């Protein structure tokens, strides 16, 4: 009887050992993340105006500020300081997406104290990042708006006319004083064809940075 018990205990012991070993080997595999076991959540849909008509979320703004142009004398020289001002008109197609067009004028910093004057036309796409992340809120006091667009400039320097164009990016910080009025600060950086400062360089392009401050007025409409 004692021999039979010993014979039975040995297989049972081996079964238990193999079971524990197999479970230990499978455990890490079960704990590993498997992306196929999960479904991604759909991104939130962009909000829309209930009854959108062209121009029913119109806004106008006036702005002025400083510009920094790359020095024509040297790549590493201190950028020259210029001025610009403008008027813009825009419309919001939804609480997130909008567009504006602008008429601009100012002067670039040129060599030897000869500053090229310019007038220009611009068009920008606007994305209300705050509304995209936190939904639309008509009484919100602070908004962050991304800007991407292009600009054409007609330049005049010492009796000579020329033109230039380029693309620019900006980030507007908007403070809403009331449902009708707002103030904003907007830093921008742009890459332009060579010659906005009246001088051609070996790099064949110019860059311009600016900091604009503006006041705006928006039209009220139904949401």
For the regions a protein language model found, what residue spans apply to each?
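N-terminal/domain-start segments enriched in small and hydrophobic, helix-friendly residues
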Residues: 33-38, 45-47, 135-146, 150, ...
């Amino acid at each position: 009887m004692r021999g039979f018990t010993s014979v039975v205990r040995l297989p049972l012991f081996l079964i238990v050992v193999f079971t524990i070993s197999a479970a230990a080997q499978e455990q890490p595999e079960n704990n590993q993340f498997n992306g196929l076991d999960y479904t991604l959540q759909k991104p939130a849909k962009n909000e829309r105006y209930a009854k959108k008509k062209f121009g029913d979320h119109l806004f106008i703004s006036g702005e002025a500020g400083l510009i920094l142009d790359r020095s024509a004398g040297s790549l590493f020289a201190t950028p020259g300081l210029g001025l610009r001002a403008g008027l813009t008109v825009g419309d919001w197609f939804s609480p997130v997406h909008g567009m504006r067009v602008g008429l601009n004028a100012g002067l670039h910093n040129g060599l030897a104290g000869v500053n090229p004057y310019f007038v220009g036309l611009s068009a920008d796409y606007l994305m209300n990042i705050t509304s995209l992340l936190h939904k639309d809120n008509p009484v919100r006091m602070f908004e962050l708006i991304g800007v991407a667009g292009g600009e054409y400039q007609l330049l005049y320097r010492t009796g000579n006319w020329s033109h230039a164009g380029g693309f620019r990016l900006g980030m507007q910080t908007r403070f809403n004083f009331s449902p009708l009025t707002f103030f904003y600060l907007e830093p921008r950086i742009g890459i332009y064809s060579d010659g906005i400062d009246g001088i051609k360089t070996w790099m064949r392009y110019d860059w311009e940075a600016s900091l604009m401050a503006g006041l705006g007025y928006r039209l009220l409409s139904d949401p």
